[in-house]
Amino acid sequence: MQGKDRKLLNIELGRVSSEKYRELPDSGIVVVLDNVRSAHNVGSVFRTSDSFKVDKVFLCGICPVPPSAEIHKSGLGAEDSVGWEHCEDTMVAVERLRNEGYTIVSVEQTVNSVKLDRFRPYATQESAEGTSQESAAETSNIGPIPSKKYALIFGNEVDGVSQEVVDASDFSLEIPQFGMKHSLNISVSAGVVLWHLTLERLRTKNAEKL
């Protein structure tokens, strides 16, 4: 019989200071919020971004920005550890990130979206050989980490990612859903997608050790 389990104490969690956090290696992932209106959601995205070591959060358009009591409350102060920047227009952030070598990904339900479970962000050239052009994004013929950088765009609570931004993206990524609503809160979507990329990154690093 397995021994009794227990919750970890706060001192056992391996938490780092804001200064140490900023010294950690970059993940190659940034989050772009396209006119997200809720300060609570923005704070939640900061909190999730801190957990998965997102390099930066871009707050675009009408997004609330720090300092904000609601952002601070829902984010547990993560806006102090995760770098952020405000852009008046999401397209300005998109073009800048493209010029910096990021693959631009809209997290949105579209006609040609790639389902998240089929997305392999850190697949090597060899693992993608023999893949059809239509499924190129699903295998990510891109070279191993850390050569690939992703800008993940999450949209407004009502309208989602704007069509202009979708058009400017390299591809769209969709979270498979099976219920009646086919709608997740933006902060929940961010958590699902960021965990997927984190899991793939961990798998890639573990495979390289074999």
Where are these regions (language model features)?
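Post-transcriptional modification and biogenesis factors for structured RNAs
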Residues: 1-210
